């Protein structure tokens, strides 16, 4: 699929996700942690994408190895940004990251964030509060 088609689909998904999160009552003016997901079967390509994302101003976490259901292995990392949950900002970031992914021949797998209540607390799901002082397995809303 061309970058233009991918971007058009991603922009539609951005709008749907932001609308759903805010309609569920997530705090509209909070600063969100946005995790943009990348993956590849080629570690070297993924590493180059991580360097490019870092140079573009994103925080980048360490690459992880994951085994898929079919037994194959992929590598993945997140490029992380912190900002309000605004569709326009997400659209710009997604466009830049889709171009980066195409350049490095890796997959951009969308983004995720957490629900934030009126008190500014992040939630993994409806009843699991994220305590920054405790370790937890992250499970973004999307």
UniProtKB/Swiss-Prot annotation:
It comes from the Bacteria. GO terms for cellular component: cytoplasm. Keywords: Cytoplasm. It is found in: Cytoplasm. This is Regulator of ribonuclease activity B. Belongs to the RraB family. Globally modulates RNA abundance by binding to RNase E (Rne) and regulating its endonucleolytic activity. Can modulate Rne action in a substrate-dependent manner by altering the composition of the degradosome. Interacts with the C-terminal region of Rne. One of its GO terms (molecular function) is endoribonuclease inhibitor activity.
